[in-house]
Amino acid sequence: MNFLGFGQSADIEIVFDGAEHKTAEVKGEDGKVEKMLLFYDGETVSGKVNVTLKKPGSKLEHQGIKIEFIGQIELYYDRGNHHEFKCLAKALARPGDLIQNNSYPFDFPKVEKQFEVYAGSNVRLRYFLRATIVRRISDITKEVDIAVHTLCSYPEMNNPIKMEVGIEDCLHIEFEYNKSKYHLRDTIIGKIYFLLVRIKIKHMEIAIIKKESTGTGPTMFNENETIAKYEIMDGAPVKGESIPIRVFLAGYNLTPTMRDINKKFSVKYFLNLVLMDTEDRRYFKQQEITLWRKADKPRYHGAQQHQQQQHQHVPLHAPPHLVSGPAAPTVAHSLISSSTDSGEVGGAPTAPGTAGSESKMGLFTRESPNQEFSQQQMDSPPLTPTPSTASVAVAVPTAASSVSEPAPERGIGDGAAAATTSASPVAMLSSSPPPLLPVSPLSRSETEASEQVQPEDEDLDAITPNTKKTGATPLATD
């Protein structure tokens, strides 16, 4: 609608680059859940602003077109004041006349987003883009919200929570939680142990409580919200009884713990243990826990894998099922396992893929199977049987004697040979020891080549540190 000839109104549309961006569900001010494009701290926000005239062929006078990236905190008890902690602006067009539809690209490179979006009972933190066509009387604006998640690293210290509480000479209980810091899809595992019971308890429950604090001083507001509640015991316990606890966090709408965000608000989480007796009296104990957001997939995994593969090589002759299978022990582990197995000389040869190697597989993660196999191919000992007590020292004399004399036959009780064979990835292809055939010239050359890579005494100290450096990351520090 024209008003005293000041120009024609238009529609504004903000389109983001990168359709592959993930979306996240964020609760709005009215309580409804909305899907928004998801960005992380340090990511570039780019796209274009499309301006469409309502009446083609008309003219729109403006004083400039701009776009802003804004981070804002809104306190519901002080709606007149919006606290902006981030504001970036870029001019898209100079003042002039717009006579046709136009598109203006924008780019905010590597924007710092230090806080995560949050919508609570008394406060709201949001990030949005605002495109504005500046006019003399009233501006034309368009706002589009985005979701921002802040990823945290694994906590260096994550001690369990253990505490003894109760009423003197009436009730003494000891509760324990496996950790004090949990990621948003973690599982809380713990137990309740009754040391003294002299009152009649009817049931016991555990609840997850969110405490939101806004403002400071006399204008501080506290809001408590029960996120989840579980009944973990029904009936009267006895002395010495232990009640297990297992709570899955993935099914609830949780946020990371926020402490003094821009000196405006805080969000904390507590585990509330409640006991109720037959007279409906309640006994409770609250314990604070820390929640943090873990990445779905490590963002640095690709670069780390490429860097490690520069120093490691997967043999071309390796069968595909062996490359993707469990890793064999490294040099240090294979020498230990050989000496251990050689003590059981009277037993049968060790079958490939023993329980000793399988028990180590659960301790490793993040590293790809190709990296584990390449390391165990480079570090695995040769197939030639050697005495376990001097497996390194006699490696060179054995190589010289194998050329002049035929290789000795392997007996069933040769424990060192069986242990060394099972430690090699080649032996994992079969489930029985190799047949006892005459040594051909080809097998001598193969045996000679394999013995030449056997480490000597002075090289053992140099090999063992490399094995430790390239080992997989323990799951406990993942």
Curated annotation (Swiss-Prot):
One record GO biological process: retrograde transport, endosome to Golgi
Q: Where is this protein primarily located?
A: cytoplasm
Give this protein's Gene Ontology molecular function annotations.
cargo receptor activity
What are the disulfide bonds? none
Positions of the UniProt region annotated as Disordered: 298-478
Write out the annotated subcellular location: Cytoplasm; Membrane
| InterPro entries, A to Z | Arrestin-like_C (IPR014752), Vps26-related (IPR028934)
Q: Topologically, how does it sit relative to the membrane?
A: Peripheral membrane protein
Please provide, in alphabetical order, the Gene Ontology terms of the cellular component aspect for this entry. Answer: cytosol; endosome; retromer complex; retromer, cargo-selective complex
User: Keywords, A to Z?
Assistant: Cytoplasm, Membrane, Protein transport, Transport, Wnt signaling pathway
Regions of biased composition (Polar residues) lie at 367-379
Bias type Low complexity, positions: 303-323, 347-356, 386-406, 416-431
For this UniProt entry, which residues form the secretion signal? none
Q: What does gene deletion cause?
A: Accumulation of wg in the Golgi, preventing wg from being secreted from the cells.
Q: Does this UniProt record's set of keywords contain Ligase? A: no
Q: Family, per the entry? A: Belongs to the VPS26 family.
Q: Function, please?
A: Component of the retromer complex which acts in conjunction with wingless (wg) and clathrin-mediated endocytosis to sustain a wntless (wls) traffic loop. This loop encompasses the Golgi, the cell surface, an endocytic compartment and a retrograde route leading back to the Golgi, thereby enabling wls to direct wg secretion. The hh and dpp signaling pathways do not require the retromer complex suggesting that it does not play a general role in exocytosis.
Kindly state the subunit structure of this protein.
Answer: Component of the retromer complex, composed of Vps26 and Vps35.
* Entry protein name: Vacuolar protein sorting-associated protein 26
GN (gene name): Vps26
